[in-house]
């Protein structure tokens, strides 16, 4: 732009292999954060100019910076650069990077892992359907982890996946039925955490529902309306079932504020928000056993026929082990929340 001769500078940048030197410099704790950010832009610029011999190593380097960098700005610069280069990677390379980021969630140090979901959620949407389903299943397993911090970041990742999921159908051209089924699975996993017995997990679920679904600037209003019609009744039930302490009150208020704002905006510009109602009623005979998968499948099949299914719970059976009614009620809630 200044009409200066930059031949010498271009020779320095693109005439030599500087990638390994940058890798080494970025991993030094003594390197100032501003230099690391410039190095990230330089590595991405190398790829933009056709030097793709080290593409996988550059993306792996970015994923490492997201996981271990001490400076938040460097993490975000690396994350944005990784997402910008994701489409250039081969399928197996994308899976390798996604697995590395997923391992970062399992560290359990929330101060480091809390920045990963924002980028893992979007990056995972570059995986083909089979690998994406495997990623969702691994996140599902993490939701049962004993460490609440690991559960929280897994939940955040599911929220980002659901929020940005509309991009996936454009990239991989799946049928509407398959796409909707996966979207409902993601929503079900988030709702299942709202029935969790740990208050911190329930709070994180409320945060995800409020910010990544109904408060999202990415999700289309039509998609929000469809999800609201599916989960409104269950959401209302679970909010009243596990009220938690004073801090949960503020989480609940923030989530309801996002939902209220969405409803007001949708009714003003899009039309009425409808909720699904079923006029047909079915009672599940005997005591519902949440540990028996066949019981749950029977109830789901009846529900798919258009029935509202009521489940009976008492203090007995379940292999003859007596438990308090409210304890059993909470176990059943966790079983059917998805």
Predicted feature residues:
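N-terminal "cap/leader" segments of large eukaryotic alpha-helical scaffolds
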Residues: 1-34
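Short sequence/structural elements of tandem HEAT/ARM alpha-solenoid repeats
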Residues: 14-18, 52-60, 91-100, 129-138, ...
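HEAT/HEAT-like alpha-solenoid repeats
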Residues: 20-31, 60-70, 99-107, 136-144, ...
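Alpha-helix N-cap/helix-start positions at coil->helix boundaries
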Residues: 32-34, 71-76, 109-114, 148-152, ...
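Residue-level signature of alpha-solenoid helical repeat scaffolds
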Residues: 38-45, 60, 80-84, 118-122, ...
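Residue-level signature of the C-terminal ends
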Residues: 45-50, 84-92, 122-130, 161-168, ...
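Nucleotidyltransferase catalytic core that binds NTPs
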Residues: 117, 121, 142, 152-338
């Amino acid at each position: 732009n200044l009409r200066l001769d930059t031949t010498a500078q271009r020779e320095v940048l693109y005439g030599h292999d500087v990638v390994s030197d940058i890798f080494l410099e970025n991993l030094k704790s003594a390197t100032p954060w501003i230099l690391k950010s410039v190095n990230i832009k330089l590595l991405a610029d190398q790829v933009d100019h056709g030097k793709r011999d080290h593409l996988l190593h550059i993306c792996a380097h970015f994923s490492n910076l997201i996981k271990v960098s001490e400076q938040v700005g460097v993490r975000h610069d690396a994350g944005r650069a990784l997402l910008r280069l994701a489409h250039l990677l081969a399928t197996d390379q994308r899976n390798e990077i996604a697995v590395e980021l997923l391992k970062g969630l399992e560290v359990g140090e929330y101060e480091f892992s809390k920045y990963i979901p924002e980028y893992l959620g979007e990056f995972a949407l570059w995986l083909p359907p089979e690998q994406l389903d495997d990623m969702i299943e691994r996140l599902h397993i993490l939701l049962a982890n004993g460490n609440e911090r690991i559960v929280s970041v897994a939940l955040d990742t599911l929220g980002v996946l659901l929020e940005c999921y509309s991009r996936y159908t454009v990239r991989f051209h799946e049928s509407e039925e398959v796409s909707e089924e996966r979207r409902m699975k993601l929503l079900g996993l988030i709702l299942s955490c709202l029935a969790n017995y740990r208050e911190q997990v329930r709070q994180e679920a409320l945060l995800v529902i409020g910010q990544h679904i109904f408060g999202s600037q990415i999700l289309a209003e039509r998609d929000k309306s469809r999800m609201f019609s599916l989960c409104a009744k269950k959401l209302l039930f679970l909010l009243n079932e596990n009220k938690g302490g004073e801090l949960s009150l503020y989480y609940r208020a923030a989530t309801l504020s996002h939902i209220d704002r969405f409803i007001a905006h949708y009714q003003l510009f899009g039309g009425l928000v409808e909720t699904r109602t079923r006029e047909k009623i079915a009672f599940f005979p005997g005591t519902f056993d949440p540990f028996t998968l066949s019981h749950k499948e029977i109830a789901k099949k009846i529900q798919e026929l258009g029935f509202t299914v009521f489940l009976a719970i008492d203090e007995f059976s379940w292999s003859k082990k007596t438990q308090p009614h409210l304890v059993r009620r909470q176990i059943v809630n966790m079983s059917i929340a998805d």
